[in-house]
């Protein structure tokens, strides 16, 4: 059948398999152009491929990659056969479509090979047209975009202009309420500054401007609750009458009352006026301005805080007023007068404390010498007063101090270079500390100033500060220390405010122990709750304000403390040597902070501000915290100490925590009351000579930030500052926690010097009260506050630092070494506190060496300050560790009080002799 096939006939030989392409070539019709050959090497195939793809898709109605690739492959040959391509494509495309396709493709290839670029001229023309069209379209789009952009710009400009108008209308309002209030007040305040002190008016103005809302609210809470919402300075001031004094009277009062202080302090003030006024004015102006702009938000925050807290503050003022009323009219009047006079006096006394530190110190020391007894009133009322009526406190300060302040200022004015510096440092540290920790400082100031005993403490502080200074540059140091203290006093004075308040209030608390404890617990919870806001606000605004006020030169001390201050705080801890005296004093006020659980808040705020400012200041709160920023910046402090965060948390969240820590603090305050029993003796001792130390001891935590920042008081102050740093952390959670570490510090400091012993003992009384507080409320206080301060606070190292600073020989190294050892030694100190009470000085020496090694790594400068403070506090340290055990504390309280009083009298006499001589 197919024999031929099997016979070997090939398909080529078989006709049946003849080349069909020949037939197809004969049969198919081809376009004429296909006759021409194309050299694909001259053709840019990549340009033609898109056209082929498009064309095949049109013919087939769908995109067939196989056909397209088949065509591409055929064209890749150098000389493709156009007819064969058409025959091959006929199967895919119809014969007709294939013919049309090849008829269109080949001319493109021919034109492409003729073109230099290998691109068909048609494509070039198309491209040109496309380009033209694109250009036209682009131009249209560009014109449209321009129009849209113009419209957008116009809209934006309109919006911006409207916003600017709104902002201007708002900012003037804000600035009117905030910066204008400082400016408005600053005009009289500037006059008053010129009169009383370049600083105090502006501190007032700043406190008024930064704290116009907070202060007004503080005033309102300070005044009656009704005036709290009123926010009207006149109403609130009228209600407080010290607020009224605040604007007109505080300055006039300080002017007449502080004239002698001002005369002496005016010399310094004029020095400071030249420098501080330029600073306080330039800084206060720039800061007032910057505060009005930059702090308008913080002020808003303060306002909102003061508003949001004003309820709390209102309750706390109510509570505080009731405690004040409970405490007696002393509390009631001292709070308004003291607090308000303090806010002015603080402001002024920050200025006047720095400027007329002697007047403020005399008033504070006068307030102090009585405060041993009045401290009850002033301690709780002043604290309350401080918080409630910062401005009220100043009038009283001025009223009380005015008579005593004038003589002591003179006494202190002769030492004014040193004592004025110290008084300014201590007073400034107290009042600035108060300003920074308004509540604490207000109380401290109130206590110092509200109780006329303050003069003795002041002399003691002067003697101690002078002893600490040892004749450090009196005028130069006073100016430098004023400057530094303006910065550091915001920290240290808040601490000193706390410690003085704590010291005065410790005696006050010891006197007011039960009633005051309840009241202070009540108030301190409200303080912890409402004052925590207030502290925030007052610390934020007060710190910012009072720090701002006080630091009007360092106006932003609040800010500085908060944002810029964080480094300054550490700087203040370690670098500012002059500040330490303030910090010593500042520590004394912080004890008030400690003694009052709210003051601990203040302390915690001031410690927060201080140690956190030290740490916080690194963070800048922003505006914080001192403390919206101040609360957040305090978180730095708090952040630095994890317990300080607790305090800070205690501040806003822990108003409950604070109330619990405050309760703990109150139980510490109970312990601190026991210790206030001891602390009263301490505060009596320290109130006189150790009162600065007490301020250290109470304030060690607050002071830890402050003192650690200043090396001069560094030993006494730095140890307590470092204590404050660690204690201030612990103070934040619980001041007494810090005290527990502080006893260690105190023991270490015990050997260095009587003053350091005093301050160490004051620190110990601080730490002692914290420890009993930690021991009595140990579960809440010591674990949370002492342990978390010491353990949680790696920043708490300052507490150990405070301990470490005690080694006066190498305060920085020892304090630094001790800083590391302090945490460990906090625990050890807690264990050894009883032994330490008896073996204080020996153990303190050993612990100093150990803590010095540990603290050496921490902060040499802060440690130096802590060592100075510890060395000074150590004499008191022995009594204070006893106080630390509260059971022993109560027994030892009488002995300690006598001992402290004797020491205070000695230091007072020394201070009087050295200032006068």
Curated annotation (Swiss-Prot):
Cross-link (Glycyl lysine isopeptide (Lys-Gly) (interchain with G-Cter in SUMO2)) at residue(s): 127, 231, 249, 447, 459, 472, 882
Modified residues (N6-acetyllysine): 140
Presence of the UniProt keyword Heme in the record: no
Numbered residues of crosslink Glycyl lysine isopeptide (Lys-Gly) (interchain with G-Cter in SUMO1): 231
Comp. bias (Low complexity): 352-368, 478-501, 607-619, 714-732, 749-772, 782-799, 850-879
Necessary for mRNA 3'-end cleavage and cytoplasmic accumulation, as annotated region: 1-156
Residues bearing the modification Phosphoserine: 227, 234, 240, 260, 389, 391, 393, 402, 414, 420, 429, 431, 436, 450, 452, 463, 465, 478, 524, 526, 528, 530, 532, 563, 565, 574, 576, 597, 611, 619, 621, 630, 640, 642, 650, 652, 708-709, 718, 720, 726, 728, 751, 753, 761, 765, 767, 769, 782, 786, 788, 790, 794, 804, 808, 810, 815, 887, 914
Biased composition (Polar residues): 428-438
Modifications made to the protein after synthesis: Phosphorylated on multiple serine and threonine residues by DYRK3 during the G2-to-M transition, after the nuclear-envelope breakdown. Phosphorylation by DYRK3 promotes disassembly of nuclear speckles.
Compositionally biased spans, kind Basic and acidic residues: 139-170, 214-234, 246-275, 503-518, 895-905
Modified residues (N-acetylmethionine): 1
Sites bearing Phosphotyrosine, chain numbering: 610
Positions of modified residues (Phosphothreonine): 220, 241, 406, 416, 569, 586, 588, 595, 628, 731, 791, 806, 885
UniProt biased composition (Basic residues): 171-207, 276-329, 336-351, 557-574, 581-606, 635-650, 663-677, 822-847
Compositionally biased intervals (Pro residues): 699-713
Gene3D superfamilies: PWI domain
Name by which UniProt lists this protein: Serine/arginine repetitive matrix protein 1
